[in-house]
């Protein structure tokens, strides 16, 4: 009888210890050990236009959705989209015109989100340039043909009546194009911020009244079809990153300083861009797509689908974005 009592006491003691272990080391520690899907995510510029994915990465928004994201900088939107088409990356935030041009040529990719609804860039010139017509025959620095800087430069030149009258020179990436301007290899540069301390703003592209998304978040059709939850996680984390930028300024300034360091300027300047241009609800707007189609001479009905706002619209309908800005749980 005593032996039975001792045995029962031992069992109770073991049971109590087991319960204590469970409470001391809760289930979330085991959840954290679960394998996360590895994602390669390309971004195409060292620019505050990319800050949404930087903040999503730094704040852990991707990880909370089971995604281990490796951000890959590829200098120029056209090259980033080539990497997506070639299967080197799972997702890319790159030049909207490069995404649309690739789709029109048959690339099996689709845009699922964007970042701006107007061109948050300006035409910066050397101090001696006083009027737009002085750019006739002059050189303008861009990253690469097919990039956002290339496309917006052409938009501005068309508006100014200078299309085909100025030379566009490729320098490679955003930093390289800035250096080209500072070393006076170019008289002008279209960029989201001043390419150098002596640069003077001649035209603010945002004031031209042109609907335009600077970048589109694109994935392959195959990945979207086979891994819809992963794509939704990417988009939701990206939207959360934008919200965090706008609602947690001290943290946002640190992230901007970290990623924008190569280009100079102050974190406050970059933050002003974020709050002014990045859309809280980053839908792909048909009018912005139409701007690109007009520039590339595309008319008539399209044979392929360029964008799908299904994920963003669903997140809006579920109140996800509202909660982010009201301090609720995502």
Can you name each region flagged by the protein language model?
Residues 1-12:
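N-terminal secretory signal peptides that target proteins for export/translocation
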Residues 32-193, 200-211:
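Short, glycine-/small- and polar/acidic-enriched structural segments
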Residues 97, 175-260:
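Pocket-lining segment of extracytoplasmic ligand-binding domains
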Residues 55-56, 121-130, 213-230, 277:
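A bilobed periplasmic-binding-protein/Venus flytrap-type ligand-binding module shared by bacterial periplasmic
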Residues 297-330:
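Conserved C-terminal helix/tail region of periplasmic/extracytoplasmic solute-binding proteins
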Residues 27-31:
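Sec/Tat signal peptide C-region and signal peptidase I cleavage site
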Residues 14-26:
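Bacterial N-terminal signal peptides
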Residues 226-304:
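Secondary-structure end/capping motifs
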């Amino acid at each position: 009888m005593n032996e039975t009592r001792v045995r029962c006491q031992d069992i109770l003691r073991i049971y109590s210890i087991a319960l204590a272990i469970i409470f001391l080391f809760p289930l979330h520690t085991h959840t954290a050990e679960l394998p996360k899907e590895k994602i390669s995510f390309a971004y195409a510029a060292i620019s505050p236009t990319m800050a949404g994915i930087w903040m999503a990465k730094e704040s852990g928004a991707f990880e909370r959705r089971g995604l281990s994201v490796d951000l890959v900088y590829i200098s120029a939107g056209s090259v980033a989209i080539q990497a997506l088409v070639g299967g080197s990356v799972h997702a890319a935030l790159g030049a909207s015109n490069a995404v649309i041009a690739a789709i029109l040529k048959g690339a099996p990719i689709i845009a699922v989100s964007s970042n701006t609804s107007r061109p948050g860039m300006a035409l910066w010139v050397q101090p001696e340039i006083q009027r737009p017509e002085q750019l006739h025959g002059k050189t303008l620095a861009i990253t690469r043909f097919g990039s956002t800087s290339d496309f917006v430069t052409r938009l501005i030149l068309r508006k100014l009546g200078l299309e085909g009258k100025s030379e566009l020179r490729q320098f490679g990436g955003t930093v390289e194009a800035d250096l080209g301007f500072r070393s006076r290899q170019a008289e002008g540069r279209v960029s989201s911020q001043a390419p150098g301390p002596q640069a003077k703003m001649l035209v603010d592209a945002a004031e031209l009244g042109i609907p335009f998304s600077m970048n589109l978040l694109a994935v392959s059709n195959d990945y979207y079809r086979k891994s819809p939850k992963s794509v939704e996680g990417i988009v939701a984390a990206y939207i959360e990153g934008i919200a965090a930028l706008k609602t947690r300024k001290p943290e946002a300034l640190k992230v901007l300083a970290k990623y924008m360091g190569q280009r100079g300027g102050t974190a406050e300047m970059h933050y002003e861009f974020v709050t002014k241009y990045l859309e809280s609800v980053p839908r792909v707007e048909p009018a912005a797509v139409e701007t690109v189609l007009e520039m590339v001479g595309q008319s008539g009905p399209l044979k392929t689908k360029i964008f799908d706002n299904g994920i963003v619209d669903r997140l809006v309908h579920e109140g996800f974005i509202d909660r982010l800005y009201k301090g609720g749980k995502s």
